[in-house]
A protein has these predicted regions:
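FMN-binding flavodoxin-like domain, especially the glycine-rich phosphate-binding loop
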Residues: 2-36, 42-173, 230-236, 240-253
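Iron-sulfur cluster-binding cysteine motifs and their immediate structural context
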Residues: 178, 183-211, 215-232
């Protein structure tokens, strides 16, 4: 049995949660990076003896469309899947059920699902520092329960909350822009999951292709990519009404 960690984590929060879950199942995991636009995902194949921890962020209550496309190319071949949805302390809404459907279509058998919290990728003051020690303890406990289910060869499907049809994909696209501090090093263009930034001139970006994942901001060594401050302020004000009360991690098994 091999444990695969299939993860989409543009700013690192989802990776932290995913690592806590997958690492508790097996210290030696095989990583499939869904942010890597150059990877041939159709070449990724598992067996029914394998386990895949599939971890994605919630974007306005849905999985990123690029995740559905890339995960859909993977050959699950009956491997057991643990779904992990990470959100910024607002709500995960239909993310897990959509991920469940995509995973099943790719040939996985879903045996468990986790909803966890990490620092909000846009308004970083919300859920700052998460996953924290309390989250890590909860996720370790979840992983133990999942491990017991695997050892018992229990293939029953969990009851996962969410709606079908899913909520309409929405949210206003917020594309970061280069500031005068940009030196065109190209780090952002190389890291963009959807190739929305011109590699020849990183100050140019295709706003319509941007998925607002904030990876370009996260990887810029000079802090030279920013969101429009007025738009960021408006989003922060909206989120302040729904992100104040601490949400806890949840296990569906």
């Amino acid at each position: 049995m091999s444990v695969f960690e299939i993860v989409f984590s543009p700013t690192g929060g989802t990776q932290k949660v995913s690592g806590l879950v997958a690492g508790a199942l097996d210290k030696n995991t095989v990583t499939v990076d869904l942010t890597d636009s150059g990877l041939d995902f159709s070449a990724v194949s598992m067996t029914e003896d394998d386990v895949a921890v599939i971890s994605v962020p919630a974007y306005a209550g849905r999985i990123p469309a690029v995740v559905a496309d890339r995960l859909g190319m993977v050959h699950g071949n009956g491997a057991r899947a643990v779904l992990v949805c990470v959100y910024g302390n607002r709500a995960f809404e239909d993310t897990l059920v959509e991920l469940e459907d995509v995973a099943k279509h790719a040939g996985f058998r879903v045996i468990a699902a986790v909803a966890a919290i990490a620092e909000h990728s846009i308004a970083r003051q919300f859920a700052a520092g998460r996953p924290d020690a309390q989250d890590a303890a909860q996720l370790a406990e979840f992983a133990q329960q999942i491990q017991q289910k695997l050892l018992a060869e229990d293939a029953s499907e969990p009851s996962i909350p969410g709606n079908r049809p899913y909520k309409q994909a929405g949210g206003h696209r917020m594309a970061p822009e280069a500031t005068e501090d940009c030196v065109s090093c190209g780090a952002c263009a190389a890291a963009c999951p959807v190739c929305a930034i011109d590699k020849g001139d990183p100050k140019r970006a295709a706003g319509e292709a941007c998925i607002s994942c904030m990876r370009c901001i996260a990887v810029c060594p000079r802090g030279a990519r920013k969101l429009d401050p007025n738009k960021l302020s408006a989003v922060s004000q909206m989120l302040s009404k729904v992100c104040v009360v601490r949400k806890e991690c949840e296990l569906f098994i």
